Design a protein with these regions (language model features):
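Alpha-helix N-cap recognition
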Residues: 94-96
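A cross-kingdom feature strongest in bacterial/archaeal respiratory oxidoreductases
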Residues: 1-72, 79-81, 86-89, 98-235
Length: 235
């Protein structure tokens, strides 16, 4: 994960890192936000290590490395194991990622544990009160197809595809009219104290009052919440 691109509030993440007394980063890639890091521990991406992922639907998927880690990189679980052992902590005596998985699932079948403990079924209904301001614009912060993680962001072939477009501030044609804007006009998009310049784009598939501004991009990483109040004015 790259905090300045992957966090829900990228600007807040940047500030927290900059103000922290000590920053230790386990990462496969060096990014701008990590200039504040006191220690960088190189870990291998998933292609260079074995491990297990659990998808959003609760599906457990294990895999093996396709190649050896580059240079001094090590699998993340090994780095954590060494740190745990060095600090004299218990629960870090593992020799393989398979042992880590077994410890998590307690020797049971992952599917059984997921079904009983980690599924998304509602156990009870909770009533919540939501206050929505109808007189302000709301940001819809989507993640572009090839900006979803550090690997695809650094893939030259993927970044040259037609799917990769310059970020825009998309909104319904009625909203464009109300704001006195034209399709294709440059606008100032502001969240909190941060603002960026983007091109306005008509998209009648969006609800009125919603402005779609992509996230996980350097140009929009200075903005605030992915889903929150937003201001749009002529540049």
């Amino acid at each position: 994960m790259e905090p300045e691109l992957d966090c829900h509030h990228a600007a807040q993440a940047r500030q927290a890192i900059a103000e922290a007394e000590c920053v230790i980063a386990l990462t496969a890639y060096k990014s701008e936000a990590l200039e504040h890091a006191d220690v960088l521990l190189p870990i291998a991406p998933f292609t260079e290590t074995s491990g297990t992922y659990m998808s959003m639907e609760g599906r457990v998927q294990s895999f093996t490395a396709v190649t050896k880690p580059l240079g001094e990189c090590r699998p993340g679980w090994k780095v954590l194991r060494v740190l745990g052992n060095t600090l004299g902590l218990s629960g870090f005596d593992f020799d393989s990622s398979e042992q880590v998985k077994n410890a998590i699932f307690g020797g049971q079948k992952p599917s059984t544990v997921v079904w009983n403990s980690l599924n998304n079924n509602l156990r009870e209904l909770i009533e919540i009160q939501v206050k929505i301001k109808s007189n302000v614009l709301q940001r819809l912060g989507e993640v572009p197809q090839f900006q979803s993680d550090a690997i695809v962001r650094r893939s030259p072939p993927l970044q040259k595809t037609r799917a990769v477009q310059a970020p825009v501030a998309a909104m319904h044609s009625q909203l464009l009219t109300e704001l006195g804007l034209d399709d294709g006009e440059m606008v100032t998009v502001k969240q909190g104290v941060a603002s960026v310049l983007l091109k306005a784009k008509r998209d009648d598939g969006l609800p009125h009052g919603v402005v779609r501004v992509p996230t996980a991009l350097p140009v929009t990483s200075l903005l605030g919440d992915l889903m929150g109040e937003i201001e749009v004015t002529r540049a």
